[in-house]
Amino acid sequence: MSCSNLTMLVSSKPSLSDSSALSFRSSVSPFQLPNHNTSGPSNPSRSSSVTPVHCGLRDLRDRIESVKNTQKITEAMKLVAAAKVRRAQEAVVGARPFSETLVEVLYNINEQLQTDDIDVPLTKVRPVKKVALVVVTGDRGLCGGFNNYLIKKAEARIRDLKALGIDYTIISVGKKGNSYFIRRPYIPVDKFLEGSNLPTAKDAQAIADDVFSLFVSEEVDKVELLYTKFVSLVKSEPVIHTLLPLSPKGEICDINGNCVDAANDEFFRLTTKEGKLTVERDIIRTKTTDFSPILQFEQDPVQILDALLPLYLNSQILRALQESLASELAARMSAMSSATDNATELKKNLSRVYNRQRQAKITGEILEIVAGADALV
């Protein structure tokens, strides 16, 4: 008998964090039996109800095997993501002190140049008529709502700019963002760039060159960077911070002027407990170097600033790429963990249905034998 109406669906469900998880569910109850009385007139009160479906034992065995195979795949993807997210987190935490300290150094140099009334193009704040929005998305799916949350943040920012009467252009980084903006030709895109499984300074430099030329040529008056900030394994948040001109606060700030520097970092170790993958977490306070507001330079501050500004652009963009990758891997790990748990539960339910139907079939055969024996007596 056909088992076409008993389906296994894979859907995205939001978890407690910003990432979502895959889930498996059955569209009908597997415990319902079909109604064989179809000769009589239909009952209007039951015409809209879902017709129960009886799956054969072979169909159920195929379902169970399919779920087992899916469970193996999701478990493997979970372990791969767990191994990768550890390396990605180390890269993020290692790069944060350098990028945050560099911003503070540039701020102090810029303060001295402003007192000397020296004009530096990359630090000059001018009336905003057009904004370049760099959107950093992922390259792959199966990571819950990671990419959707980021794209919704970009859409909200675009609506805000339109409401203010400010023109904008998009620099899309990542395959998911590229495919989204390609399908929407009414959104102006300056450039499409591919992401990387292991972001490097070379990848960041390609983006930095583009935003540098746009800002210096005054095609845009402001450059904003939209990416997903890595907070912990179970939490990540899309943030927008101003890349150019240089922040007047001497720290990495979002578009509202709030600091997005990490006050502390979460370190974790992957261990096994009772045959299952577990995570041990440690919270470590982020240490930054305090600089005196009065700095002495051997070289001309303008020369130092000209040398550090390209490094500033590269480091900030590289940091965004690294944090986005770590957030994507953490979301994928969470999604695959949830999918594995749901596959295990679905396998138990299908096995229970299979055993009940097998038992009912054996009981029916025994009753037929007994009835046949009674008929011969």
Curated annotation (Swiss-Prot):
PROSITE patterns xrefs: ATPASE_GAMMA
GO CC annotation, single: proton-transporting ATP synthase complex
Region (Disordered): 30-52
Low complexity: bias regions: 37-52
Domain of life: Eukaryota
Membrane topology: Peripheral membrane protein
Transit peptide location on this chain: 1-55
Paired cysteines (S-S): C253-C259
BP term (GO), one: proton motive force-driven ATP synthesis
Pfam families: ATP-synt
SUPFAM superfamilies the record matches: ATP synthase (F1-ATPase), gamma subunit (SSF52943)
UniProt-annotated catalytic positions: C143
Principal place of residence: plastid
Location within or outside the cell: Plastid, Chloroplast thylakoid membrane
Keyword annotations: ATP synthesis, CF(1), Chloroplast, Disulfide bond, Hydrogen ion transport, Ion transport, Membrane, Plastid, Thylakoid, Transit peptide, Transport
GO MF entries: proton-transporting ATP synthase activity, rotational mechanism
InterPro entries tied to this protein: ATP_synth_F1_ATPase_gsu, ATP_synth_F1_gsu, ATP_synth_F1_gsu_CS
Gene3D superfamilies: 3.40.1380.10, ATP synthase, gamma subunit, helix hairpin domain (1.10.287.80)
PANTHER family per record: ATP SYNTHASE GAMMA CHAIN (PTHR11693), ATP SYNTHASE GAMMA CHAIN, CHLOROPLASTIC (PTHR11693:SF41)
Function noted in UniProt: Produces ATP from ADP in the presence of a proton gradient across the membrane. The gamma chain is believed to be important in regulating ATPase activity and the flow of protons through the CF(0) complex.
Family named by the database record: Belongs to the ATPase gamma chain family.
Subunit structure: F-type ATPases have 2 components, CF(1) - the catalytic core - and CF(0) - the membrane proton channel. CF(1) has five subunits: alpha(3), beta(3), gamma(1), delta(1), epsilon(1). CF(0) has four main subunits: a, b, b' and c.
Name of the molecule in the record: ATP synthase gamma chain, chloroplastic
Gene encoding the protein: ATPC
